[in-house]
Design a protein with these regions (language model features):
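C-terminal accessory domains/tails appended to large, multi-domain proteins
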Residues: 107-282
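Active-site loops and adjacent core secondary-structure elements that bind or stabilize anionic groups
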Residues: 1-154
Length: 282
């Protein structure tokens, strides 16, 4: 796998690794999930001929990207434990939310904190914190033509996700190394047939975009060209951030509706006004 550069940084006491990596587009192309690309263009369920035409145009644009752009990734591996619904990373407390909807008998209401060993166990666990993005120029070089702009943006989104896919693979197999013997095809990777998850900020299990401010504190998003808006949204738009869990039973889930009681408790744990948290969760 060809990478332009990987930079390691000086570590805090609770950080086991912090790395910034630039990826070539050619490295990422096999890991693009075209199903989501077709969905973005409203082609899900459409005839294959329409998808093939769209794919051909996209591949042509990707050819032009290869000599002009790169993507960028940051990943930190940290010692961690859970404390109730909070994840403790050194002196950083990362509050999580928990499902509140009724479940079948014997099934728990889940929180991402459940996938980290509790502090009371006396055993230190680990967690990954990551972000990926594209060159800012990629989002600015296609503004004069609406169709080209939309095509470039949807490809940029896919490339940011493909970067996260490749980064997660490297974390599992070597950087963290909890699955050193993993040997999956690209199709199996895209089906997520591996141990561990990487829930992203703004998605169903971690919908609060302001979590990005905590992620920024941990891995310094500016190092890969990401800046945050007042709500924690990322610029460039084609950026992904989140957490990596290695627990063998970790899986994705949707939080669903959050009650007013938990909203207030979560705001208290975040140290932020309830109405501000309510806005972040919209």
């Amino acid at each position: 796998m060809r990478r332009a550069v990987a930079r390691r940084c000086a570590l805090e006491s609770r950080t086991t690794m912090l790395q910034y990596t630039d990826y070539n587009i050619s490295t990422l192309r096999p890991y693009i999930n075209w199903l989501y690309f077709y969905f973005a263009w409203g082609l899900s369920g459409k005839p294959q001929e329409a998808k093939d035409r769209m794919r051909a145009e996209a591949e042509q644009m990707l050819d032009s990207f290869e000599t002009r752009y790169q993507t960028h990734a940051a990943v930190g591996l940290f010692e961690a434990n859970s404390d109730g619904d909070d994840i403790l990373i050194g002196d950083v407390r990362l509050p999580m939310l928990r499902q509140q909807h009724p479940t079948r008998e014997g099934e728990p209401n889940l929180s991402l904190a459940d996938f980290i060993r509790p502090q009371a166990s006396g055993v230190t666990d680990r967690i990954g914190v990551f972000a990926t993005t594209v060159d800012l120029a990629l989002e600015h070089d296609f503004l004069t033509d609406d169709y080209q702009r939309m095509l470039a943006q949807t490809l940029a989104d896919r490339l940011a996700e493909a970067t996260a896919e490749v980064l997660h693979m490297e974390v599992r197999r070597s950087l963290w190394g909890y699955a050193p013997d993993e040997n999956l095809s690209v199709a199996e990777l895209l089906r997520e047939d591996f141990q561990g998850i990487r829930p992203a900020v703004g998605y169903p299990s971690m919908p609060d975009t302001s979590v990005n401010f905590i992620i920024d504190r941990l891995i310094n998003l500016k190092q890969i060209g990401i800046r945050l808006t007042e709500s924690g949204a990322m610029k460039p738009h084609a950026s992904v951030s989140g957490l990596m869990f290695a627990h063998p039973k970790a899986h994705y889930f949707e939080l669903g509706r959050i009650g007013e009681d938990q909203l207030r408790d979560y705001a208290h744990r975040r140290g932020l006004p309830v109405e501000l948290i309510r806005r972040f969760l919209k």
